[in-house]
Amino acid sequence: GFIVIPRIVHTDTGICMTGGHAWDEVEEADGPWAIRKEIRKQVRDGAEWVKILTTNRESYPELTQEELDAAVDEAHRQGVKIAVHSGTQPSIQMCIDAGFDTIEHGTFLTEAQARQMAEKGIAWTPTITAYTYLYEQTKQMIEAGVDMDNPIAARAVHDQAFFQPAFEAYRDNFKKLYDTGVTVLAGSDMVLYKAPPLPIHQELGYMVDYGITPVEAVRTATYNAASV
């Protein structure tokens, strides 16, 4: 027999600069033409979407404006859509200027930028669940006592300095950003510290906790996602 399943849109591996965010898990490419080549290879192999990664947890953008512009241009030239992992400033603005189809995380997105995204048709996938998990996990590790000779514990101390303000940014700003009219998408992300699977309904629950209605939250995982 047959069963009905969700429509699955295929992406290939992400693309970052040499030594960039998740470099050991994605493809590295430097310069506009290397990025264009990697996108062409992925489209050749069946990718329907492309993902670029351009921030880690620092304030500097990893890819240049020229590289971001080239990535968007090539993906759209090839007839596919393109997402970008970007959480900090000024990278978020650079990605808006480049014209990506979605911004993943957008952790420190401003209201003015969200309005720009709404005007340009750029969607936002906040991934609240991932950052909440990472904040809570690193907080628990620190409260349990940190052995700085343990590299995982030492990393938790370093990461907590980012994950706490990230958690607070989502909690304090999500509803204001949603109200700008930017298209919001539900997403879970893959995270660190041996995280369990992060179900979409948990993401929708945080959205409701932070101020939108249950129907609006469900829409982020259904109609909004299908329309992008």
Protein language model regions, located:
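Catalytic cores of alpha/beta
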Residues: 89-97
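Divalent-metal coordination cores built from histidine and acidic residues
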Residues: 1-81, 113-153
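His/Asp/Glu-enriched, well-ordered alpha-helical/loop segment
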Residues: 77, 155, 166-228
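Short hydrophobic/aromatic-enriched beta-strand-loop microsegments
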Residues: 4, 100-108, 124-126
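Glycine-enriched alpha-helix->loop->beta-strand junction motifs that scaffold or abut catalytic
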Residues: 96-102, 118-124, 181-182
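A cross-domain feature marking catalytic cores of carbohydrate-active enzymes
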Residues: 12-13, 52-54, 84-88, 105-107, ...
